[in-house]
UniProtKB/Swiss-Prot annotation:
The gene is accD. Binds 1 zinc ion per subunit. This is Acetyl-coenzyme A carboxylase carboxyl transferase subunit beta. Pfam families: Carboxyl_trans, Zn_ribbon_ACC. A zinc finger (C4-type) spans 26-48. InterPro entries: AcCoA_carboxyl_beta (IPR034733), Acetyl_CoA_COase_Trfase_b_su (IPR000438), ClpP/crotonase-like_dom_sf (IPR029045), COA_CT_N (IPR011762), Znf-ACC (IPR041010). Signal peptide: none annotated. Component of the acetyl coenzyme A carboxylase (ACC) complex. Biotin carboxylase (BC) catalyzes the carboxylation of biotin on its carrier protein (BCCP) and then the CO(2) group is transferred by the transcarboxylase to acetyl-CoA to form malonyl-CoA. GO terms for molecular function: acetyl-CoA carboxylase activity; ATP binding; carboxyl- or carbamoyltransferase activity; zinc ion binding.
């Protein structure tokens, strides 16, 4: 009688030791991508063109002239002004994300050139506390607006945020009015402001400076809105249009000016800056 035992793997063979992070699964098409190739492609899927998140330094490298970026306001740091208590203190969270991201805050600001045109630049990083806007984020952005106004130099803000930072309470909500007021002065002086919305741009950020650009761009399929769809549905008791918080829906309704593929972003910005300056 033949044995029905399962074949045994020879003891001499070992499982392959695959380094962690070698492959990345695309949420758009579920394919596995070689991480190094993905990074060389500006973190855009080769197959479905899904745009993965970028860290602030990566975004800066993608759009600025090489070696032109000079960081400003790096000395500003958030503090736990309210003594926020939770599972972890606010200070513990700040320390954790500073170590994790090698950033001081959720926004990196500075001066640069794009196509040899001087620009003041603010780039938010969702990896730092969800890109949330606290008092320091609001202050850094406001200072860059004021620098732009003083130098009559175009301003570019790249948003990636879940909204206001709850650990700072009203201090974070105040930044909405502060940044909006500063942008009003910039507008009155006819200094160009370009806003780029990336995935996600939500809540207090889209309700303030992110939606006030002279030109508003967005990355493909970026999630953009004030509240989450579940909250809106429960509040209004109405069925919501499919994809109503995507860049494509907002473009159709006229709330943004153009959707720009990441590979075309630098050339698009160069053209816009040329026309606006």
């Amino acid at each position: 009688m033949m044995s029905k035992d399962k074949p045994q793997i020879p003891s001499g063979e070992k499982m392959l030791d695959i380094p962690e992070g070698l492959w990345t699964k695309c949420p758009g098409c579920n394919r596995f991508l070689y991480t190094k190739e993905l990074e060389l492609n500006q973190s855009v899927c080769h197959y479905c063109q899904h745009h993965f998140p970028l860290k602030a330094p990566e975004r800066i490298a993608c759009i600025t002239d090489p070696g032109s970026f000079i960081e400003c306001e790096k000395h500003l740091h958030s503090v736990d002004i309210l003594g926020f208590n939770g599972e972890k203190s606010y200070q513990e969270r700040l320390d954790y994300y500073r170590n994790k991201t090698a950033l001081d805050e959720a926004v990196v600001c500075g001066s640069c050139t794009i196509g040899s045109i001087p620009v003041f630049l603010c780039v938010m990083d969702f990896g730092f506390l969800g890109g949330s806007m606290g008092s320091v984020v609001g202050e850094k952005i406001t200072r860059m607006i004021e620098k732009s106004l003083s130098a009559k130099t175009p301003l570019l803000i790249i948003s990636a945020s879940g909204g206001a930072r709850m650990y700072e309470g009203m201090f974070s909500l105040m930044q909405m009015a502060k940044t909006a007021a500063a942008l009003q002065r910039l507008s009155q002086a006819h200094v160009p402001y370009i806003s780029l919305l990336t995935n996600p741009t939500m809540a207090g950020v889209i309700a303030s400076f992110a939606s006030l650009g002279d030109v508003i761009l967005a990355e493909p399929k970026a999630m953009i809105g004030f509240a989450g769809s579940r909250v809106i549905k429960e509040t209004t008791q109405q069925e919501l249009p499919p994809g109503f918080q995507t860049a494509e829906f907002l473009l159709e309704k006229g709330l943004i000016d153009k959707i720009v593929h990441r590979k075309e972003l630098r050339s698009t910005l160069k053209q816009l800056l040329y026309f606006l300056t």
